[in-house]
UniProtKB/Swiss-Prot annotation:
Name of the featured protein: Large ribosomal subunit protein bL27
Source taxonomy: Bacteria, Pseudomonadati, Coprothermobacterota, Coprothermobacteria, Coprothermobacterales
Region annotation Disordered: where it falls in the sequence: 1-21
Keywords linked to the UniProt accession: Ribonucleoprotein, Ribosomal protein
Family listed: Belongs to the bacterial ribosomal protein bL27 family.
The UniProt record lists the keyword ATP-binding: no
Gene Ontology process terms (BP): translation
Amino acid sequence: MAHHKGGGSSRNGKDSNPQYLGVKAYGGEKVKPGSIIVRQRGNHFWPGKNVGQGKDFTLFALAEGVVQFEKKGGKKFVSVIPNEQK
């Protein structure tokens, strides 16, 4: 008769890969178009002016300028203030 001994239970489980989430460009930093500003799960920060949002909720710059964080109506918005053209 074939037997299979029971597998032991895991105590600590597996170690998952790091996700590297968070703010990548802080307020006052200069960014170029396409620069990632925030990596997040869900909308912790919302896109403001000159900021786009990817399907994984990543916020990125649409224009060259300076990052600005602001609160409006209980939400945190991230905007990029364009550089003055000379």
